[in-house]
């Protein structure tokens, strides 16, 4: 599906990002496994290569313009260009996050610089290289928290949705599409570490399909949105959530 294509996946050292990176490699893409956790990214890239795929790892702080540019330069140097970007990097605080009125502002600013601003920073770093290749596609990681929760994790994802829609308007003329996936509760190490078990149980009870999702449940949507099958889709947010959010 993605032979001769190059994809950058941020936050790819574990969990959802790892699943995206491995799936893209299985479909023939050359993958840049990018993460602030350099050792984790290296391990994922090594496994992709062991499985017969093509990958390199790059350390990146998505909130830092110079770091994002270095990531892109490394990708272009290794593979000659960039076709796809998956903005998956995030700080995840689970449901124990403070409300806006009580969160320490220093932490709030750091949190937003990664979960919200990082989407824009990486998109700005990559889009000209996509345009040089005649276009490309970007998938942003949102969350159903944008509609459900009153803390700043949800607020960051509201912002990601807004960025997705505005950037679709700005990038469309360059034949670059951008969409977002909004997962419901996903069973990852991050979720298990920071979300109280009772809250997880309560969330599952609100999901018509009666279970948490897995990273693999999101892979199909990501691959579709990057592929030519989605060539007339941009600026959209797609819930992949077991029915957690059902809207008319």
From Swiss-Prot:
Assigned keywords, A-Z: Oxidoreductase
InterPro entries according to UniProt: NAD(P)-bd_dom_sf, SDR_fam
Family: Belongs to the short-chain dehydrogenases/reductases (SDR) family.
Binding residues for substrate: 143
One Gene Ontology biological process: fatty acid elongation
NCBIfam families, alphabetized: PRK07231.1, PRK07774.1
EC number: 1.-.-.-
Positions of the catalytic residues: 153
Single GO molecular function: oxidoreductase activity, acting on the CH-OH group of donors, NAD or NADP as acceptor
One matching Pfam family: adh_short_C2
Protein name per its UniProtKB record: Uncharacterized oxidoreductase Rv0769
Tree of life domain: Bacteria
Record carries keyword Oxidoreductase: yes
